């Protein structure tokens, strides 16, 4: 009995399970069915009694009682009257909680248009009626009448009439001869009378017959919305409201403040306005007030309802008493503070605490130190339960008292409770999944949380006052997940690139580096030629060595011989003698015993890179447990030796090179020389600037190299033994702290500085910090520092926003199946930039599955199809000299709604094949977004020291023989080979005949090699001036000018500072007289006729604006000589500042500012008639299809001449190509390769490594949609965009029925657009543009099937990824089985019925 009573009291609403959510426009009947009563008065509560007014906005009769089980007048109290309705005050006796979900309504005296369907672009009402929004507003806000039924009058249907026109028409045709109405009633009437089917049929006919370009698009839009209404079951007139719902009062509370005032939700003000105006309107109608007054009141009612739904969308924003705009219903959903992002996606949690972190070097990797006070508070319920179970307390109250008094037994119990109960630590900002990790708590005194030093890198934490939050996983499942998936020991590798993230840094690195140094001539070293003491410095076991170290008869750095005992390749014990040092032997003592981890792993100088590689080796071969133990051990070793070494530095450790001033003087002379050249008019101002900056950059580099040489050199003492290495060099070289760039500023020269605008200041800072800066230099250096700080603040926000968009677009990319079975793949090759291999093939294909057998030249199969390429395969692949590998990629994965494990490859954070249900999309987004923030925070570390962008030569990175493709080279007057073609490529062929590298040469480059030459590594292939683009003659002859008229298309400018004249092409399009000039330089023969080129056209070279002409008419010219040159922009510093916006631009698939123009087909070029201020260029394809025309702005430099032949995909105008063009011209694979390379380029510049597959996942999500080019036999319209998977499903059906399939081309969407076009409207609405998304979803009656992660978080169910994917799978299997059982049953029933009907009648009885 007792139990039942308790159950009655604690009746929780049972959570309902549902599979999908539908949204549609609500009908007036629906609104009334939700409502518990009409609200007739604007009053809220009585200010004296604090009781709600009857029929007011808080009415208890409508919305329910204020206190649990108590009516308003107090006649019925307590549980026993549950469900009774009080006859005096009309309140139902029930829980007060119903005030959170009971709604009311307001009956409007005049219909009102719903502002979302009217004003949210495109206006749905406008599209449906085919009327302009302006006209609709004039009708709705009572400015114009609309003709509804013209009758026999000459008026047209839906014609707008002003007041005068309406009255005139009534006089002219009689009052009853036509019907015209005004206001929302008119619109409602028109909407009700719409014949949707008829309109749809006529629209389809019109689309089929229309000839114009733009019309079908407009008609399609209208047809789409009409079909949406037909399919969704919404009625058009529902977009006009006759009833307004009122949300429950507890969701718009009114709270009394002290001092008799009230704080209220803005919604109450907005509702009050609506009720007041509605009641006034009712009264005016009853009083039969003049039309004009009623009309004004109706307009005000419309405005009040508009403000309630979406304040500020139309007209003035309605403000409250304090001039602050009121928050309407739409504002409640929108933005960061709206319902979606504030409450549904991010919730506050209990059982959490936060405190400052301090370092805990004696912790194990899986532990964290938790202050006792904090633990006591966090684990309270567990402690109460344990106290109760152990009999220390009989009631919770007693247990509470014991805990409050902090009795000794409580601490013992706390120890028990905490044992093996992991807690989660989180540091904001959580940029990737390693920002939350689980640890086992260890109780400590004090109030700060202790953190293990090795996990700092993952959290990006330091101990300068950072705070961290602790969360307690409560349920057993949560504890299990925390331990198995989130424990810090399970997160050794970085999900972005698969390298270890548990890597020692700073002190530890310094200690290990110190430990592994070798010093010549140290005490007790082994000398092979020492006859007196041949066994000095020879050691056989560790005990002997430790003894010698303790006795100081040998130092840590002495060269010794050492017998190492370990395991051979077959796992048998072996021993070998090594030349090494005692320090390295100590280090080898912590290595795990394993055949693949020999002594060579530690027998080298341990820099940070080497340590990382060592941890990686141990992890790959010995597994996770060994690695964790090993990491803890090397940490302890590193700390202890760093402290014993006692490394510190003073000012004398900063060694300034002796020849500093001579180098500086040389550069100064060079700069003077450039100034002189400029004064003599040999070079332009821009060129001088570039050269000066270049000279100083070189000087600065040279000095830095000198200084590094001095600092890294090892000095000898008087006994000929090595002195200790320079401390600063040790810190920098080991990777503990500081970089060569910072050392350069300390001891060489600070170098060039950048202005805030990004330009480099010509005068560098010659002093270094040791010498000190003078005032001017100090001032120059402040620019960079300020810019750094300002940038940081701005970019943190930008980077966070980029991450948010990436997560949103990729959140539903989850591993759904093991293998999708596709045979497609993408081709991978090494990335070579300016002859340097920046990403070798082996790194790019590691951990990916092959799409075809990988075969060596002798026919042996190295890796079979669909097998993952592991570390063990790489030596064979490299040995076989394979240049290109076809691998599986998510870009070609055929899995519906997700990706498959084979296409994805290895899970980088585990080093194993990826698990089912892994949320690879979110991991990809975090991997790309996290370094964005990191980098932006790093801009100011080198304090604006300028790094110059362009390289001006290309060197070979291989040995081999030279072949030249598309050869068009000429020897110029100086005897140099000059590339006179656009597509000249130098190919380096290896000894085995494979192409090792292909370098496309810059037009006008000086080529240093020729066909058949042999080339060595590091040899120059070609060089060019990075600051100018030349226009080069292709034949010998005499210079001629064409259309170059002084003052019209060419001008002689005299430089003020030098007095030298030079000829520059000016913008000739300014006046109509000169607009059709085509300034050009010609190469003429002896008769003064243009020389014919090999391809048949004249040697005529069109000049762009600002070209500087180098030769006079009549001058002799050799092929390869420069006729004119165009200065390019001066060198800007490259910094991720350019980087982050660039990444965003690529992911958003925006057209770059001056996009390249790419040839759509292979063919020949001809110049046509100019059009206004554009050049017309015609491309005649080789395949005989229609010619393509390009209009190019006149100032743009077109480097093609008449008659040039271009290949498909060649650039006609240089620039950054637009991704859409690449997709259209070269296809998906090329586009993906371009995006991956461009994005990687930005990150590589900053030294961040991200695996390609992450970028591929995002690109896959950007390519989800297909644009229909031919609807086939379906009812899908041409030009529609549909999902790839939908297209496949449609075509499957059509082909099965023997019909014509749909044709489509892939479309590239930017990440924002792609996020807003996901199938799930809940996900899209919680991302951006909430109003627009919800309006569209409601009109279409969309159903959200809750497939993605975000929707499930919002509705509060388990996400279908990770451990939640299992639950989802089980549910789907259960559903399938239920269906099978139902089918069987129905089949059995049918069979039984059939049997019964077959029985003879007598037997049936």
Curated annotation (Swiss-Prot):
One of its GO terms (molecular function) is DNA binding. Mg(2+) binds at residues 462, 464, 466. Binds 1 Mg(2+) ion per subunit. Binds 2 Zn(2+) ions per subunit. Zn(2+) 2 binds at residues 820, 893, 900, 903. Keywords: DNA-directed RNA polymerase, Magnesium, Metal-binding, Nucleotidyltransferase, Transcription, Transferase, Zinc. Its cofactor is Mg(2+); Zn(2+). Pfam families: RNA_pol_Rpb1_1, RNA_pol_Rpb1_2, RNA_pol_Rpb1_3, RNA_pol_Rpb1_4, RNA_pol_Rpb1_5. PANTHER family: DNA-DIRECTED RNA POLYMERASE, DNA-DIRECTED RNA POLYMERASE SUBUNIT BETA. This is DNA-directed RNA polymerase subunit beta'. The gene is rpoC.
């Amino acid at each position: 009995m007792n139990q039942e009573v308790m159950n009655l009291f604690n009746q929780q609403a049972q959570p309902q399970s549902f599979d999908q959510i539908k949204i549609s426009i609500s009908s007036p009947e629906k609104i009334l069915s939700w409502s518990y009563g009409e609200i007739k008065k604007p009053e809220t509560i009585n200010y004296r009694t604090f009781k709600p007014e009857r029929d007011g906005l808080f009415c208890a009769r409508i919305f329910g009682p204020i206190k649990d089980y108590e009516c308003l007048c107090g006649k019925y109290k307590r549980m026993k009257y549950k469900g009774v309705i009080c006859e005096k005050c009309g309140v139902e006796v029930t829980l007060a909680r119903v005030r959170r979900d009971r709604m009311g309504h307001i009956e409007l005296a005049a219909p009102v248009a719903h502002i979302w369907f009217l004003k949210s672009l495109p206006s749905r009402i406008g599209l449906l009626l085919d009327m302009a929004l302006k006209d609709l507003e004039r009708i709705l806000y009572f400015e114009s009448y609309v003709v509804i039924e013209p009758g026999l009058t000459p008026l047209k249907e839906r014609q707008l009439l002003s007041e005068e026109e309406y009255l005139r028409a009534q006089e002219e045709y009689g009052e009853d001869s036509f019907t015209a109405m005004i206001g929302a009633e008119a619109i409602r009437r028109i909407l009700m009378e719409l014949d949707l089917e008829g309109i749809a049929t006529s629209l389809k006919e019109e689309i089929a017959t229309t000839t114009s370009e733009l019309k079908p698009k407009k008609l399609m839009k209208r047809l789409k919305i009409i079909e949406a209404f037909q399919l969704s079951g919404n009625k058009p007139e529902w977009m006009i409201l006759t009833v307004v719902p009122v949300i429950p009062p507890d969701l718009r509370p009114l709270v009394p403040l002290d001092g008799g005032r009230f704080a209220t939700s803005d919604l109450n003000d907005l509702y009050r306005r609506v009720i007041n105006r509605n009641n006034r309107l009712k009264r005016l109608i009853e009083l039969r007030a003049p039309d004009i007054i009623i009309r004004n009141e109706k307009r005000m009612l419309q405005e009040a309802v508009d403000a309630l739904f979406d304040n500020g969308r139309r007209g003035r924003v309605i403000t409250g008493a304090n001039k602050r705009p009121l928050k309407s219903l739409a504002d409640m959903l929108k933005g960061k503070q709206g319902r979606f992002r504030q409450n549904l996606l991010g919730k506050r949690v209990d059982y959490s605490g936060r405190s400052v972190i301090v370092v805990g070097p004696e912790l194990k990797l899986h532990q964290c130190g938790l202050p006792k006070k904090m633990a006591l508070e966090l684990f309270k319920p567990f402690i109460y339960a344990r106290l109760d179970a152990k009999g220390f307390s009989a009631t919770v109250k007693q247990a509470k008292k014991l805990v409050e008094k902090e009795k000794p037994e409580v601490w013992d119990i706390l120890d028990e409770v905490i044992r093996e109960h992991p807690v989660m630590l989180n540091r904001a900002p959580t940029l990737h999944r390693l920002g939350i990790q689980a640890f086992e708590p260890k109780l400590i005194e004090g109030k700060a949380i202790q953190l293990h030093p090795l996990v700092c890198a993952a959290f990006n934490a330091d101990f300068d006052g950072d705070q961290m939050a602790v969360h307690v996983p409560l349920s057993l499942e949560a504890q299990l997940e925390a331990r198995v998936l989130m424990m810090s020991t399970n997160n050794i590798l970085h999900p972005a690139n698969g390298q270890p993230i548990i890597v020692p840094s700073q002190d530890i690195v310094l200690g290990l580096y110190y430990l592994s140094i070798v010093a010549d001539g140290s005490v007790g070293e082994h000398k092979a030629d020492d006859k007196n003491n041949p066994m000095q410095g020879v050691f056989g076991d560790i005990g002997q060595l430790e003894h010698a170290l303790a006795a100081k008869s040998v130092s840590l750095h002495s060269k010794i011989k050492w017998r190492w005992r370990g395991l051979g390749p077959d796992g048998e014990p072996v021993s070998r003698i090594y030349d090494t040092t005692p320090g390295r032997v100590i280090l080898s003592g912590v290595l795990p015993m394993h055949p693949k981890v020999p002594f060579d792993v530690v027998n080298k100088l341990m820099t940070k890179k080497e340590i990382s590689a060592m941890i990686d080796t141990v992890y790959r071969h010995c597994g996770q447990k060994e690695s964790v133990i090993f990491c803890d051990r090397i940490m302890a070793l590193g700390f202890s030796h760093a402290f014993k070494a006692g490394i510190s530095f003073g000012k004398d450790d900063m060694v300034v090179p002796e020849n500093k001033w001579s180098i500086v003087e040389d550069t100064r002379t060079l700069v003077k020389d450039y100034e002189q050249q400029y004064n003599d008019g040999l070079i332009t101002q821009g060129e001088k600037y570039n050269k000066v900056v270049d000279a100083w950059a070189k000087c600065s580099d040279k000095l830095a190299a000198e200084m590094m040489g001095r600092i890294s050199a090892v000095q000898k003492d008087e006994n000929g033994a090595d002195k200790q290495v320079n401390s600063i060099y040790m810190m920098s070289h080991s990777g503990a702290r500081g970089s060569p760039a910072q050392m350069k500023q300390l001891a060489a020269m600070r170098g060039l500085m950048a202005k805030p605008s990004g330009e480099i200041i010509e005068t560098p800072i010659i002093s270094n910090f040791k010498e000190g800066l003078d005032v001017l230099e100090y001032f120059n250096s402040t620019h960079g520092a300020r810019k750094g700080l300002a940038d940081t603040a701005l970019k943190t926000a930008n980077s966070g926003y980029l991450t948010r968009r990436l997560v949103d677009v990729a959140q539903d990319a989850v591993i759904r199946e093991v293998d999708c079975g596709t045979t497609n793949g993408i081709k991978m090759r090494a990335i070579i930039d300016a002859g340097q291999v920046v990403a070798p093939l082996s790194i790019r294909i590691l951990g990916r599955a092959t799409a075809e057998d990988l075969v060596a030249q002798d026919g042996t199969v190295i890796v079979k199809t669909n097998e993952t390429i592991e570390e063990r395969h790489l030596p064979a692949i490299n040995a076989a000299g394979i240049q290109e590998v076809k691998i599986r990629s998510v870009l070609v994965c055929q899995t519906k709604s997700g990706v498959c494990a084979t296409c994805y490859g290895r899970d980088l954070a585990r080093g194993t094949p990826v698990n089912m249900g892994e949320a690879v999309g979110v991991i990809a987004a975090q991997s790309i977004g996290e370094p964005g923030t990191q980098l932006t925070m790093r801009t100011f570390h080198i304090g604006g020291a300028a790094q110059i962008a362009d390289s001006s030569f290309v060197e070979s990175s291989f040995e081999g023989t030279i072949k030249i493709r598309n050869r068009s080279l000429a020897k110029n007057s100086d005897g140099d080979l000059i590339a006179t073609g656009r597509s000249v490529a130098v190919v380096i062929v290896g000894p085995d005949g494979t192409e090792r590298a292909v370098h496309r040469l810059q037009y006008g480059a000086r080529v240093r090699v020729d066909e058949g030459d042999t080339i060595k590594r590091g040899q120059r292939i070609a060089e060019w001036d990075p600051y100018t683009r030349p226009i080069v003659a292709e034949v010998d002859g005499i210079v001629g000018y064409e259309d170059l008229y002084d003052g019209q298309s060419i001008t002689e400018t005299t430089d003020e500072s030098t007095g030298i004249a030079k000829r520059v092409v000016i913008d000739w399009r300014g006046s109509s007289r000169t607009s059709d000039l085509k300034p050009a330089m010609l190469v003429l023969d002896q008769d003064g006729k243009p020389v014919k080129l090999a391809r048949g056209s004249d040697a005529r070279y069109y000049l762009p604006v600002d070209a500087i002409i180098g030769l006079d008419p009549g001058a002799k010219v050799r092929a390869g000589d420069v006729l004119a040159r165009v200065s390019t922009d001066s060198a800007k510093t490259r910094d991720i500042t350019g980087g982050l916006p660039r990444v965003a631009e690529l992911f958003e698939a925006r057209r770059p500012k001056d996009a390249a123009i790419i040839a759509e087909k292979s063919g020949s070029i001809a110049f046509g008639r100019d059009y206004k201020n554009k050049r017309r260029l015609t491309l005649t394809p080789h395949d005989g299809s229609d010619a393509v025309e390009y209009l190019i702005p006149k100032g743009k430099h077109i480097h093609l001449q008449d008659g040039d032949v271009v290949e498909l995909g060649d650039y006609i105008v240089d620039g950054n190509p637009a991704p859409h063009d690449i997709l259209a011209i070269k296809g998906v694979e090329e586009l993906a390769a371009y995006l991956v390379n461009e994005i990687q380029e930005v990150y590589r510049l900053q030294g961040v490594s991200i695996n390609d597959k992450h970028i591929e996942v995002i690109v896959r999500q950007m390519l989800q949609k297909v644009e229909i080019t031919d609807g086939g036999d379906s009812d899908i319209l041409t030009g529609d965009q549909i999902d790839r998977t939908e297209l496949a499903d449609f075509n499957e059906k059509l082909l099965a029925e023997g019909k014509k399939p749909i044709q489509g081309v892939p479309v590239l969407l930017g990440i924002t657009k792609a996020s807003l076009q996901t199938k799930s409207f809940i996900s899209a609405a919680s991302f951006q543009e909430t109003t627009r998304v919800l309006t569209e979803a409601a009109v279409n009656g969309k159903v959200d099937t809750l497939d993605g992660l975000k929707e499930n978080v919002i509705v509060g169910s388990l996400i279908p990824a990770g451990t939640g994917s299992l639950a989802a799978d089980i549910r789907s299997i259960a559903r399938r089985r239920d269906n099978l059982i139902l089918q069987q049953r129905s089949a059995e029933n049918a069979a039984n019925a059939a049997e019964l009907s077959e029985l003879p009648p007598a037997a049936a009885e």
